[in-house]
């Protein structure tokens, strides 16, 4: 074991407040020797933004330890685009910046890709323009399939829905549980799947992503999925722990003491 990929909401944060054991987990990871990254489907904040949010909750984590679905989406677009690098982006500044930094020009006409994330400025014109461009041949890409985030916040899947209904075309979702997101995170850490653990609270995103990518998986019961939910799934996590407090001894056992 050389590395840990860890979800944020439901593992270390809940409604922007630290969960039990969060500070101890963060401090332990920062001391080493494990490489680690906090992986989130939330596309509307940069790593620096997330680091500030964590700091407000008393968790000191440098920005370089965060990887988002916006970053993975930009990486996916780079690999797919070839010489076609023109995109219409529906999203906040973090996604727009990631796509721009990937070498794309941003436009609302004659584009190669329509990229949808999350934005508080979502409106009729955005829906109409996105649908029009997709119907004219633009490829439909979305950051993540989640319909709702913490506190019932509308997430990417909710923004995608009307565009999908109008066009009759489903997007390619980059974020968890897509294996592309996991491979991007592994590359970010510089490790192989058999050297890394996936820690998360959601069977439908975190755990299935880890299972499909060949990682050891740990379900933390302080978030979305509970032990009683497991009967609904054909797959299982390798480990189940109550919270981050219970995760620490497990990590110490597997690494010979952190």
Regions found by a protein language model. Name each.
Residues 2-8, 13-32, 43-67, 74-258:
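Asp-based, Mg2+/Mn2+-dependent phosphohydrolase catalytic module
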Residues 40:
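Conserved phosphate-coupling serine/threonine residues in phosphotransfer and NTP-handling enzymes
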């Amino acid at each position: 074991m050389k590395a840990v990929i860890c979800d944020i909401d439901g593992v270390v944060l809940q409604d922007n407040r630290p969960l039990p054991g969060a500070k101890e987990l963060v401090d332990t990871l920062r001391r080493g020797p494990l490489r680690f990254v906090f992986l989130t489907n939330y596309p509307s904040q940069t790593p620096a933004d997330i680091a500030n949010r964590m700091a407000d909750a008393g968790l000191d984590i440098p920005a370089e330890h965060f990887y988002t679905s916006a970053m993975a989406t930009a990486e996916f677009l780079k690999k797919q685009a070839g010489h076609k690098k023109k995109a219409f982006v529906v999203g906040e500044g973090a996604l727009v910046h990631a796509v721009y930094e990937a070498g794309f020009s941003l436009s609302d006409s004659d584009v190669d890709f329509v990229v949808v994330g999350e934005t508080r400025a979502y409106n009729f014109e955005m829906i109409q323009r996105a649908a029009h461009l997709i119907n004219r041949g633009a490829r439909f890409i979305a950051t993540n399939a989640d319909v709702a985030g913490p506190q019932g916040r509308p997430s990417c899947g909710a923004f995608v829905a009307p565009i999908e209904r109008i066009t009759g075309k489903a997007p390619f979702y980059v974020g968890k549980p897509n294996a592309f997101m996991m491979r991007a995170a592994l590359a970010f850490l510089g490790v192989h799947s058999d050297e890394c653990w996936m820690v998360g609270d959601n069977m439908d995103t975190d755990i299935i992503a880890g299972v499909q990518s060949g990682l050891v998986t740990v379900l933390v019961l302080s978030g979305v999925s509970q032990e009683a939910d497991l009967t609904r799934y054909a797959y299982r996590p390798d480990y189940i722990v109550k919270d981050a407090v219970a995760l620490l001894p497990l990590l110490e056992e597997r690494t010979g003491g952190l």
